[in-house]
């Protein structure tokens, strides 16, 4: 299992991951078709100060990151209207834009009032408009909100740009001195804040479905234990402290149960805890390593990684235990399952053959076909946006652990800005509004 024993130290010591992936014989990577051109014109600002954030740039980046839209570069814009009445549609037809957005920002009573409108260039008809207000510090929030509204109006898919991201950084100062930091940021890596620091590893952070709590593995006191923490207050409590492995926490869709991996009875297996009663049920049993649980949407099914067949593959089973059904058959390594919002696509770490080249891939669960989404070779820990349009994953670039974003259609692939040190273990929040 990409050496499942590395996996176990990545289940014990990296319990977010027995994961990583490679190419495949279907090798479909990025960009076989074009994203829709859209122009997000710089918003007009009727104020004296310089704003700390460029709302139009943030909105354009959001729409680009989805893989659905390709923003027109600012330097290609023939005109820059800020009001609908100022739009000259032939200018936007000339640069190939199919949609265009204008907006204005007006100071009002110590706050900023933002008006925006989105147009179909070909028909010259308004598609959507709205207003939002907030403080200067909330400019990014307002921009992500406008992105969400616009994306849903254009595609019928709820926008996921106002969501958050968890990840872990590791800064090594000397052989025996490493600082691990659990961070929360905007989905695009901006505005990172520290939730926890430790001299021991922090692994597998996961948002609860309410977005207010997280679970993670901490190696405080030199052994893995699972903790639950309130994001706002910082208050936390220990959930497991069994002998051996305690790792890979995964919240049920209703937030009332937590699946995780324990080795207290021998082999690493998946268990489920009722968080109300703290009663634990064993879900898997038998030979091999069973790890990386991930819940189906209805809370009755758990997907997981197992080497019971000799090499790591993805299986599914009832959350109450019982027989398991194999899900993946393409490639000699498939691990770390995540589902798209509609549960039609399985995102995973995939390897076709050999011992290297671990890539993020997406399997169509109806057809069984697998599409490679990345071109790197040491990918791990994929996490999927709540609307299923984007994947963030950890990989290595120039000898450093970094986070990357790829659209599920493969059109966009880009690095996320993060802090210094090794960055790993990303986890996407649910919708927060």
Swiss-Prot record:
GO terms for cellular component: periplasmic space. Keywords: Cell cycle, Cell division, Periplasm, Signal. InterPro entries: 6-blade_b-propeller_TolB-like, PD40, Tol-Pal_TolB, TolB_N. Pfam families: PD40 (PF07676), TolB_N (PF04052). Disulfide bonds: none annotated. One of its GO terms (biological process) is protein import. It is found in: Periplasm. Residues 1-21 form the signal peptide. SUPFAM superfamilies: TolB, N-terminal domain, Tricorn protease N-terminal domain. It comes from the Bacteria. Part of the Tol-Pal system, which plays a role in outer membrane invagination during cell division and is important for maintaining outer membrane integrity. NCBIfam families: propeller_TolB. Belongs to the TolB family. The Tol-Pal system is composed of five core proteins: the inner membrane proteins TolA, TolQ and TolR, the periplasmic protein TolB and the outer membrane protein Pal. They form a network linking the inner and outer membranes and the peptidoglycan layer. This is Tol-Pal system protein TolB. It comes from Pseudomonas fluorescens (strain Pf0-1). The lineage of its organism: Bacteria, Pseudomonadati, Pseudomonadota, Gammaproteobacteria, Pseudomonadales.
């Amino acid at each position: 299992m990409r050496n499942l024993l590395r996996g176990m130290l990545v289940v014990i010591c990296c319990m977010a991951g027995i994961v990583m992936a490679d190419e495949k014989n279907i090798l479909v990577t990025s960009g076989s078709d074009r994203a829709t051109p859209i122009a997000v014109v710089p918003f007009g600002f009727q104020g004296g100060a310089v704003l700390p954030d460029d709302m139009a740039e943030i909105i354009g980046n959001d729409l680009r990151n989805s893989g659905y839209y390709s923003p027109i570069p600012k330097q290609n814009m023939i005109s820059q209207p800020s009001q609908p009445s100022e739009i000259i549609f032939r200018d936007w037809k000339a640069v190939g834009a199919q949609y265009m957005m204008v907006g204005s920002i007006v100071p009002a009573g110590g706050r900023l009032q933002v008006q925006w409108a989105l147009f179909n260039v070909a028909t010259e008809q308004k598609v959507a408009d709205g207003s939002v207000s907030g403080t200067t510090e909330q400019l990014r929030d307002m921009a992500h909100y406008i992105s969400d509204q616009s994306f849903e109006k254009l595609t019928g898919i709820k926008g996921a740009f106002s969501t958050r991201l968890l990840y872990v950084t590791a800064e090594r100062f000397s052989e025996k001195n490493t600082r691990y930091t659990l961070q929360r940021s905007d989905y695009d890596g901006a505005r990172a804040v520290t939730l926890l620091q430790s001299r021991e590893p922090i692994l597998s952070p996961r948002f609860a479905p309410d977005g207010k709590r997280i679970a993670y593995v901490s190696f405080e006191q030199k052994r893995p234990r699972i903790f639950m923490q309130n994001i706002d207050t910082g208050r936390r409590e220990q959930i497991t402290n069994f002998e051996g492995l305690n790792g890979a926490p995964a919240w049920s869709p209703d937030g009332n149960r937590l699946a995780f991996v324990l080795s207290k009875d021998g082999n690493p297996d998946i268990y489920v805890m009722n968080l109300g009663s703290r009663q634990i049920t064993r879900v898997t049993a038998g030979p091999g390593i069973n790890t990386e649980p991930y819940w189906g949407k209805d809370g009755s099914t758990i997907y997981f990684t197992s080497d019971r067949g000799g090499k790591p593959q993805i299986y599914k089973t009832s959350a109450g235990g019982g027989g398991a059904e194999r899900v993946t058959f393409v490639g000699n390594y498939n691990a770390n399952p995540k589902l798209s919002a509609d549960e039609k696509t399985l995102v995973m770490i995939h390897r076709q053959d050999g011992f290297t080249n671990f890539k993020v891939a997406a399997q169509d669960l109806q057809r069984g076909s697998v599409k490679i989404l990345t071109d790197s070779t040491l990918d791990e820990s994929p996490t999927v946006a709540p609307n299923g349009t984007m994947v963030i994953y950890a990989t290595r670039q120039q000898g450093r652990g970094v986070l990357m974003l790829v659209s599920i259609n493969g059109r966009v692939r880009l690095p996320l800005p993060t802090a210094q040190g090794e960055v790993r273990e990303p986890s996407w929040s649910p919708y927060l509004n």
